Amino acid sequence: IEDLHHCLKHYGKRIVDRLMDWGILGEKTLLGHCIYINGHEMDLIKETNTMVVHNPESNMGNACGCPPTMELVHRGILTGLGTDGYTHDMTESYKVANVLHKHHLCDPNAAWGEVPQMLFDGNVKIAERYFPQKLGVLKEGAAADVIVVDYDPLTPMNGGNANSHILFGMTGKQVVTTVANGKVLMKDRELVSCL
């Protein structure tokens, strides 16, 4: 919050207003955290087609607050899920984001749809703004980024409950094989190649 106070004291403007003045906002700009933004700033982010990445574990670990991430998603702002280096396990970020917003909003139904949307749709759309390959699908011509997870579900798994299985049953420690851009990098937990 110190950066917001600094901007208000020295420039009489909020952070996103200053970014707008400098021409920084736009479809190739990715804002991190956005913890203390208000409705006006969200409007600017939306109008400029700027993207946001939510880093729940970093925000919690630094005790700097909970951003209005659910509102960003509901306003149609392209929002992804990240780690800010706090962890490298996106399933953990998925879990933390899910419970953080339930707790913050005092609503056990919050974040069920928004967090998987950020992880599986938002992250793909954000990456596609920077990389020419088709991402997020398994089809000819796409980047073919795939992980294989050693997971034995205790209950039947299908398309309707896969997100719940990922949320409650899987962790990054269960990844046994990784394929990036069609190239096997790790097989049976052994590194076999570099990018």
Predicted feature locations:
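Short, acidic/turn-prone active-site loops that include or flank metal/cofactor-
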Residues: 56-61, 84-86
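Histidine/acidic residue-rich metal-binding segments in metalloenzymes
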Residues: 1-51, 63-79
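Short, charged, surface-exposed secondary-structure boundary motifs
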Residues: 62-66, 90-92, 158
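Active-site glycine- and acidic-residue-rich loops that bind
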Residues: 60-63, 129-131
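His/Asp/Glu-enriched, well-ordered alpha-helical/loop segment
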Residues: 22-24, 70-153, 167-171
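Flexible loop residues that form catalytic
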Residues: 34-35, 102, 152, 183
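C-terminal cap of metal-dependent C-N hydrolases
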Residues: 143-192
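Conserved, mostly hydrophobic/aromatic
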Residues: 31, 45, 52, 94, ...
